[in-house]
Regions:
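Conserved catalytic-core helix/loop/strand module for nucleotide-ribose chemistry
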Residues: 1-229
Length: 229
């Protein structure tokens, strides 16, 4: 079977999970990760010297290093999360009304989603309900394919309606990905479902390592969509 046929088969067996990145939200005018960090540096009045350091990190696609500079300047993790939630909420209120892939995803009935975005666009366009990964502890893994879980979304890195849930700093990434519960729950998802990554560039070296660790620890087939260009 070719890749399209495999994905169609996964969908028919209710084992296909689109994993959505920021690339799907940027066309609507939402800020990129780089823009969020730059705006945060301005908002918290980070010194010009440290801003220069942040820009160098961003030019190297080292986003967590750039975030570290802001936090070391005296901004708390919680302050940064609250600003990000506020900034993203305002950006959504002023976002562009354009054709987008969220509308396409909403057309599929038997599907679950994961996302690393904070913006909750999947909730908006697909009328998806938030489902936290840790909730899998209380259920059998095959139950997640039941119709009761159609159109639920797992926000891996938090969501703007819950600023305290947002994963942005290096410390918060490590706390999430290195916990035994996350590894166990994500492993079950990764080995029982097929992921289709959408809107990812994988430019950030730290994120590359995280996904390489997550996806290649055991053999499993997953897919990623890239722009033709």
């Amino acid at each position: 079977m070719d890749n399209i046929q495999i994905l169609q088969e996964c969908y028919s067996r209710v084992t296909l999970i689109p994993v959505v990145g920021s690339g799907l939200s940027i066309p609507m005018g939402l800020p990129s990760w780089r823009e969020l960090i730059e705006k945060s540096a301005d908002y918290f009045s980070i010194s010009d010297e440290k801003k220069e350091c942040i820009c160098k990190c961003l030019d190297r696609n080292e986003y967590l290093d750039a975030t570290d500079v802001i936090l070391k300047a005296g901004v708390s993790d919680q302050m940064l999360r609250e600003y990000i939630a506020k900034s993203m909420t305002e950006a959504k209120e002023n976002s562009n009304s354009v054709d987008n892939n969220y509308l396409d995803l909403a057309l599929f009935s038997k599907i679950r989603y994961m996302t690393t975005n904070y913006d909750q666009y999947i909730n908006d366009f697909a009328e998806a309900k938030t489902f936290c990964l840790e909730d899998l502890e209380n259920m059998q893994i095959n139950q997640f394919a039941y119709s009761a879980y159609d159109h639920v979304v797992i926000p891996l890195h938090g969501e703007i309606s819950r600023p305290e849930s947002i994963v942005l700093s290096r410390d918060s990434y490590q706390k999430l990905y290195n916990t035994d519960s996350f590894k166990f729950e994500f492993e079950h998802m990764r080995t029982h479902f097929t992921f289709l990554f959408m809107g990812f560039s994988f430019e950030d070296k730290y994120i590359q390592k995280l996904f390489d660790k997550i996806l290649h620890h055991y053999q499993a087939q997953h897919f990623i969509l890239f722009d033709k260009s």
